A protein has these predicted regions:
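A fold-level detector for beta-propeller and closely related beta-sheet-rich head/sensor domains
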Residues: 1-200
Length: 200
C-alpha cells in the first residue's frame, strides 16, 4: 500500500464494518494518497446483507443436543457458515426475538493462494474485495476466498467417566479460495473443569 496505516485505518474497518463506508471512501482514497478507492455497500434498512456471497459452503447448526433439552427456543445453539468475504461466520442463538446473532467472524488470513488468482494469501486479497470496482470488470473479478466444505461435530458427554462438558467444533477447507484447512472450537464446556469455552 502507499500508506502504512491503510490496513489499520481503512481496510480493517471496511472488512469488519466497524467504520462507515462513506467515511472510508471519502477519507482513504487514491486522491488522499491511499492505494485504492473503497467500495460502498448497500446501507438501506431493508437490505440486511452483511455477509459475502456463500457459494458451495454449507450453513450448519450444532450444539444443544438432539432433543429439546439444551436447545435455545427449539434451536441448536450455534449456526456457522463460510463466505467469499474471506470470513467464517459464527452465530449464537439467545432468544426468540433474535434467533441468531453474529458473534465472531474468523479470517484465516495467512492461508496461501495461487498468486494468479489474486493476492498471495487471504489477507492480501481482502483489499481486492473492498475495491470500488470489485466484481464489475475483468480487471476486478469476483474472488473465491472461502467456499470449501465445512463440518461441525459435538463431543460426547460421559458424566460417569468424569467428562462433564461437551464442546462444539467446526472443521473447514478453503475450497477455491486457498490451500489449507482450519478448525475452530466454537463453544461448550471444558471436558475436565466444566468451565465455559469458546463463544460460551
Amino acid at each position: 500500500t502507499k500508506k502504512k496505516d491503510e490496513w489499520k485505518n481503512a481496510l480493517m474497518p471496511w472488512v469488519t464494518r466497524s467504520g462507515q463506508d462513506n467515511t472510508i471512501k471519502d477519507t482513504y482514497s487514491e486522491a488522499t494518497g491511499y492505494s485504492q478507492n473503497y467500495r460502498l455497500r448497500e446501507t438501506s434498512p431493508s437490505d440486511k446483507r452483511n455477509l459475502g456471497d456463500i457459494i458451495d459452503s454449507s450453513v450448519l447448526t450444532v450444539g444443544g443436543g438432539q432433543t429439546t433439552d439444551g436447545l435455545v427456543d427449539g434451536r441448536n445453539e450455534f449456526l456457522v457458515t463460510a463466505a467469499n468475504d474471506g470470513m467464517v461466520h459464527l452465530f449464537q442463538s439467545k432468544n426468540d426475538t433474535h434467533p441468531y446473532s453474529l458473534k465472531l467472524s474468523y479470517i484465516p488470513g495467512g492461508m496461501e493462494r495461487d498468486a494468479s488468482y489474486g493476492g498471495k494469501n487471504i489477507a492480501e486479497t481482502l483489499k481486492e474485495v473492498a475495491h470500488e470496482k470489485y466484481g464489475r470488470d475483468a480487471s476486478h473479478p469476483h474472488r473465491y476466498l472461502i467456499n470449501g466444505g465445512i463440518v461441525v461435530r459435538r463431543t460426547a458427554e460421559d458424566v460417569e467417566a468424569g467428562i462433564i462438558g461437551q464442546q462444539s467444533f467446526l472443521f473447514g477447507t478453503m475450497g477455491q479460495g486457498a490451500r489449507g484447512a482450519y478448525a475452530l472450537n466454537i463453544g461448550g464446556k471444558g471436558r475436565i473443569t466444566g468451565k465455559a469455552v469458546g463463544l460460551n
